[in-house]
């Protein structure tokens, strides 16, 4: 699972996801990609599940780039604990994803395989996505 090796602070504020992605909105590495269409927090487990679905369908051919990283800790209090007495312990790591952000990029496979693989990966994510392809140069 993806998580930072070291952080400045153990816990973070919840925050909000405003606006659209300006950086990471275009394909940089691969020929095909999966682009987010809505703001959402995506967990490290969801990223890993999508990556596995992607590589399995591609039969380990080609190359995959993960363009997001879960760097935000989400804390949770144990079950049946009264309110108060501080914030809970960090439970999982999430990535804040803005609309327009490219989540995955792939290369080395044909359009049909790429579309099917990215559709399978999209099913593992809690967000509406779109298949994008680099314009032939």
UniProtKB/Swiss-Prot annotation:
**Cellular component per GO?**
cytosolic large ribosomal subunit
Sorted alphabetically, which keywords does the UniProt record give?
Ribonucleoprotein, Ribosomal protein, RNA-binding, rRNA-binding, tRNA-binding
Gene Ontology molecular function: rRNA binding; structural constituent of ribosome; tRNA binding
**Signal sequence range:** none
Please describe what this protein does: Binds 23S rRNA and is also seen to make contacts with the A and possibly P site tRNAs.
Q: Which PANTHER family match?
A: 50S/60S RIBOSOMAL PROTEIN L16, LARGE RIBOSOMAL SUBUNIT PROTEIN UL16M
Q: How does it assemble?
A: Part of the 50S ribosomal subunit.
Family named by the database record: Belongs to the universal ribosomal protein uL16 family.
| Descriptive protein name | Large ribosomal subunit protein uL16
The root-end lineage is: Bacteria, Pseudomonadati, Pseudomonadota, Alphaproteobacteria, Hyphomicrobiales
């Amino acid at each position: 699972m993806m998580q930072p090796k070291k952080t400045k602070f153990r816990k973070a504020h919840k925050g909000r996801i405003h606006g659209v992605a300006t950086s990471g909105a275009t394909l940089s590495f691969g020929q095909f990609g999966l682009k987010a269409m809505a703001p959402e927090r995506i967990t490290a487990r969801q990223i890993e599940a999508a990556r596995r679905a992607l590589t399995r369908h591609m039969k380990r051919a080609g190359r995959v780039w993960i363009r997001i990283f879960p760097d935000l800790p989400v804390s949770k209090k144990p079950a049946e604990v009264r309110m108060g007495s501080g914030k809970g312990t960090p439970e999982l790591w999430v990535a804040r994803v803005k609309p327009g952000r490219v989540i995955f990029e792939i290369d080395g496979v044909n359009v049909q395989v790429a579309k099917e693989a990215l559709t399978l990966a999209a099913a593992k994510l809690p967000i509406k996505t779109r298949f994008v392809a680099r314009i032939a140069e």
